[in-house]
Amino acid sequence: MKISVGKKVKDLAVISSDNKKMLSDYLNKNLILYFYPRDLTPGCTTESNEFNDSLNKIKRLGWNVVGVSRDTIKSHEKFINKYSFKFPLISDESEKVCKMFDVIKEKSLYGRKYMGIDRSTFLVNRELEVLNIWRNVKVKGH
């Protein structure tokens, strides 16, 4: 199933930095789910810090923030601790969440092609319905 605005996403088992077990465990509020390529890299750090800096305002508006990458929980814990993030990160080493949201894309770095995460953000309501999608976003001001 291709993810699009208005579609419902499946509830999936997840491995997260805050020990939540299912995607729906985050749905006590609406959810900002952002996918980023890699922990502790300049662009991903900037993006995550901007979410963290805006977190109080985001929560007052009724939203939770959760980041997703293919990094390990150990890597996520280092990332969270180094920058004092106040939101959880999902470890998607199996790519099941990434594939469901269709964020694994062919990329190129120094002429080498590889499959990586396309920086994307999804708004998902409490009923697991996708409200909005931003794909291939720029880091700054995201």
Q: For the regions a protein language model found, what residue spans apply to each?
A:
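Chalcogenol-based redox active-site neighborhoods
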Residues: M1-H142
